[in-house]
């Protein structure tokens, strides 16, 4: 099943750092233009990267990752987002690792139908990783039910392989170094971050503000990156 890739390109606007915040979802307002960043993950812990940027009634999510590791962290994947998925207007992915992309199938199941912008390599990797993640979620639930290791009746997967396959149709590839408009009045520019194939840093510009999301960085000279 090949998702209908679409590339968007538009013109645009100009400086501000993202400040480190605590482990819980926290907000930071930047001046009268009220650009609001809510840290939903990747803060206080490495995994679960989700950064909700809000302005003038529009909401854009940078990364959509799963919490991984200890049980207390994994349980956070079952908590609803503070904003209904259907009210998020666009998603940008820095790269395909599940702690940055693995929540997408759940977003789809919760009603998100907007575009998910990522490099072509990230889209291709997500087409492998997300269905595999859904399959493993189903396998884990089946194992718990088969051996009676669950307090729930029955244990359910966080999402299914089918959910993951459906979510792939939201992916829209973008190119490095080519600014585009993920939403009216917003500009995003992806640049190479090394790390893995397709990994990007994302410069987001809105309301005269510039916010750089580095994503995961490193190893830009590995042969596989070239």
What are these regions (language model features)?
Residues 33-48:
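N-terminal metal-binding scaffold of metallo-dependent hydrolase/deaminase domains
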Residues 43-45, 55-114, 118-171, 217-226:
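Pre-active-site segment of Zn-dependent metallo-hydrolases
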Residues 36, 40, 54-55, 174-226:
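Catalytic core of the metallo-beta-lactamase
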């Amino acid at each position: 099943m090949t998702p209908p890739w679409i590339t968007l390109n538009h013109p645009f606007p100009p400086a501000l750092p993202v400040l480190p915040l605590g482990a819980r979802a926290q907000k930071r307002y930047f001046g009268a233009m009220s650009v609001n960043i809510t840290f939903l993950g990747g803060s206080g812990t490495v995994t679960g990267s989700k950064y909700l940027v809000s302005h003038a009634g529009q909401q854009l999510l940078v990364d959509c990752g799963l919490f991984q590791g200890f049980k207390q962290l994994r349980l956070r994947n079952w908590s609803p987002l503070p904003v209904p998925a259907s009210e998020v207007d666009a998603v940008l992915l820095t790269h395909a690792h599940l702690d940055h992309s693995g929540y997408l199938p759940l977003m789809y199941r919760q009603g998100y139908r907007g575009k998910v912008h990522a490099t072509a390599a990230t889209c291709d990797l997500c087409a492998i990783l997300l269905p595999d993640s859904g399959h493993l979620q189903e396998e884990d639930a089946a194992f718990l039910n088969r051996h009676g290791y669950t307090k729930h009746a029955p244990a359910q997967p966080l999402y299914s392989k089918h959910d993951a396959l459906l979510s792939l149709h939201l992916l829209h590839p973008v190119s490095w170094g080519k600014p585009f408009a993920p939403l009216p009045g917003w500009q995003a520019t992806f640049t190479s971050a090394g790390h893995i194939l397709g990994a990007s840093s994302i410069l987001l510009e809105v309301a005269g503000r510039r916010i750089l999301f580095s994503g995961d960085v490193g190893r830009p000279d590995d042969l596989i990156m070239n």
